[in-house]
Amino acid sequence: MAIERQVTEAEEPVSPFARLFSLPGLDVFNIVTIGCKTEGNASTIVEGIKNTLINHPRFSSILVTGHGEHKGKARWIPTKINVEEHVIVPDIDPNIENPDEFLEDYTSNMALSPMDMSKPLWEFHLLKLKTSHAEAVTVARFHHSLGDGMSLMSLLLACTRKTCDPEAFPTFVAPKKNKAKNVCFSLVAWLWFIVRLMFHTCVEVIKSIVFICRASDTSAHIMGKPGATLSANKFIHRIISLDDVKMVKNAMNMTVNDVLFGMVQAGLSRYLNQRYDLETSSKSRKNLHNIGLHGVVFFNLRPNRNIEDLAKMMAKGSKCRWGNSIGYVLIPLGMKPQDDVFEYVRQAKTIMDGKKHSLEPLFSYGLLKVTMEVFGLRGLKTLVKRIFGSTTMIFSNVVGPDEEISFFGHRIAYIAASTFGVPQALNICIQSYVDKLIINIGVDVDVIPDPHHLCDLIIEALRMMNSAAPKKVFHASKV
């Protein structure tokens, strides 16, 4: 196959959300770090991308945001693409003293490096660097205008195959569905579902509107700087056992997501309380327990909520849409210290159940679309900055493959994803892969100068839950 490929498709308009994510001050990117169990081979990756990734029109087109006489007419323009220009192999000393720290610095510096808008907005950096968890590392960077995290992860996983079966796509754990015992039970359950849906939707939508109109997070210790998106970022990740989380999940009869959000909230609470203990008066420490902090959690709005491979997503008649198709919910964060670490998980479950049983994600998506249609791009930008600039963190949990996969012949050890260019000073993305969970934390170091300590506190919360979980199961069995 030739190195250069001529794309003949006609120009395509840019969606409102793609334009939003390319505006100055809202230039949002996704970074995916792939740890490999084998040494990286650039030529293999280049050849693989030629046969997969660039077949998607978004990845072989230039984004024109509108300028000069064509101002306002944003569009995708198909172009010739030289894949080698998008696969970067930096010269790295193989005997570098601290490879893990080098990887953190490298990915962090990518957040400050602008992308060349004259080329398709994606790139792969192949680091021939042996770290604690990988023999080599590939770091992919995608502009958010190409699609939301679900779309981009699907596209990336479409480039992979099962290690045990090189022709098979990755598989994912399917969510369990409750089966009704009889028609009457099914009817009652359906009616109860509708009642709960209407109630929770009204409550959560009203809360969301009140927050947009009046509220804002008040802790300078963890808030991003207003309007700032490109600042001194730091990206770190840790790998923990999925079984440890499932142990707590089973002990409390909750979901993995409940446990993850609970441990994040526990770690964040301890972190912020420690910061206040060191830097403020006792009166301020009391006020910390009452301040209103909020997180943003994204929901996939596609009918099929599992990550799909690109072949299924792009197939004719697929129920899964391509592009930015996500909603968000606003989650209150309790900073009051709890004597019982499980209380954080209980709070997380109560909050998340209300969100999951409401239409708030659809409302938030619809609000952004209506704002765009009525007030235009400037109004949409103002609303987005109002919402995301007044919240403390972004939290996301992505379900990954349940079996080991290979990326163009490179066996994958882990996958860590994150987003940068957002106003929040804290971005936590948790990605599952086989029997692992990868916690990826992105911070603004001017606001959170010690992200490793924050990550330690989050993982320590899980250890505390694990230590107490067997006793909790024993107590429950006796009761």
Curated annotation (Swiss-Prot):
Keyword Transmembrane: yes
Keyword Lipid biosynthesis in annotation: no
EC number: 2.3.1.20, 2.3.1.75
Residue stretches spanning the membrane: 183-199
One GO MF term attached to the UniProt entry: diacylglycerol O-acyltransferase activity
Residues exposed to the Cytoplasmic side: 1-182
Main location: membrane
Active-site residue numbers: 144
Pathways involved: Glycerolipid metabolism; triacylglycerol biosynthesis; Lipid metabolism
Induction record: Up-regulated in the stem epidermis during active wax synthesis.
The entry's keywords: Acyltransferase, Cell membrane, Endoplasmic reticulum, Glycoprotein, Membrane, Transferase, Transmembrane, Transmembrane helix
Catalytically driven reaction(s): an acyl-CoA + a 1,2-diacyl-sn-glycerol = a triacyl-sn-glycerol + CoA; a long chain fatty alcohol + a fatty acyl-CoA = a wax ester + CoA
Broad enzyme group: transferase
Lumenal compartment segments: 200-479
Membrane topology reported for the UniProt record: Single-pass membrane protein
Subcellular location: Cell membrane; Endoplasmic reticulum membrane
InterPro entries named among the record's database cross-references: O-acyltransferase_WSD1-like (IPR045034), O-acyltransferase_WSD1_C (IPR009721), O-acyltransferase_WSD1_N (IPR004255)
Expression sites by tissue: Mostly expressed in flowers and siliques and barely in roots and stems.
GO cellular component terms, A-Z: endoplasmic reticulum membrane; plasma membrane
Disulfide bonds: none
One record GO biological process: triglyceride biosynthetic process
Protein family: In the N-terminal section; belongs to the long-chain O-acyltransferase family.
Its biological purpose: Bifunctional wax ester synthase/diacylglycerol acyltransferase. Involved in cuticular wax biosynthesis.
UniProt name for this protein: Wax ester synthase/diacylglycerol acyltransferase 2
Organism: Arabidopsis thaliana (Mouse-ear cress)
Gene transcribed to yield this protein: WSD2
